[in-house]
Amino acid sequence: MSTAINSDLTDRSKRWVVGIDLGTTNSAMSCLPLQEEANLESVSITQRISENQVSRLPTLPSFLYLPGEHEMPLHAMELPWNQELDYAVGAFARTQGAKIPGRVVSSAKSWLAHRRAEPGEAILPWEAVKEGRKVSAIEASRRYLAHMRDSWDYDHPEHPLALQELVLTVPASFDEIARDLTIEAADRAGLENVTLLEEPQAAFYTWLWPRRKTWRHNLSGVNEILICDIGGGTCDFTAIKIDEDGLRRIAVGDHLMLGGDNLDIAIARLCEARLGVKLNL
């Protein structure tokens, strides 16, 4: 009897398809109702933006700040759903990490694909301050996903994120190990039933959906499509073949640790050269 009741509750709680982009520098969520015609919506994510302010932002910066024992009051990390946090995730973590880089974890996603490091070993921040706390790449990813779960659940108490149809994007160039580690991070965050979708394909589907009835006309004369996904920490390339049977993925580029972060540094170096000063990068 209890099993039937629990199943009924689960069915009534499942209302959305939720897409999660666990990014190298920024993470995001979008949702679409299952039972009605509607447009895709971006999901704002509640997060701390300073010691004294919590706000809703369109993305969650993928930064984890691990403060020292007496660095700041505990209330500086409180969130509406948890008043006992001893770390910060998101905008405040990014801002605080710029002040003390040795206490902030960034680019955890890249470490999931790093074969010369153990993703389950607590090695981040890579250049941590002396006696500073460290976490693994999997744990950092778990905290980002858990934060997005908690923010969603706070806004949708009757429709918990874990009970929705979940799609989690990964780079097309992620190997099976990196994909399994992403699934493990989601499992640890309480998101056990997720479908992985390659990021360039997700971008292409976004273009394709409003043209689903006319795409052959839109792509008349085109034989192949190259999707270039330049992210915060990686570049991802996917080639799609157009033939009589439809669309077929035919190639994926190598995993390139090159992205917006590198572009920022290149611009900063150019500014240094032109200004004739050394910047604190």
Could you say what each language-model-derived stretch is?
Residues 173, 177, 225-226, 254-262:
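Alpha-helix capping and helix-loop boundary segments enriched in small/acidic/polar residues
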Residues 52-55, 195-201, 258:
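Active-site nucleophile and cofactor-binding loops and adjacent substrate-binding regions
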Residues 36-37, 155-158, 188-195, 214-216, ...:
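Secondary-structure transition/capping motifs at alpha-helix termini
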Residues 6-40, 212-249:
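Gly/Thr-rich phosphate-binding beta-strand-loop-beta motif of the actin/hexokinase/Hsp70
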Residues 41-188, 265-281:
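Phosphate-binding loop and its immediate beta->loop->alpha context
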Residues 3-4, 13, 143-159, 206-216:
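Phosphate/ATP-binding catalytic cores across multiple sugar-kinase/actin-like superfamilies
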Residues 175, 198-205:
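Short acidic loop-to-helix transition motifs that present clustered carboxylates
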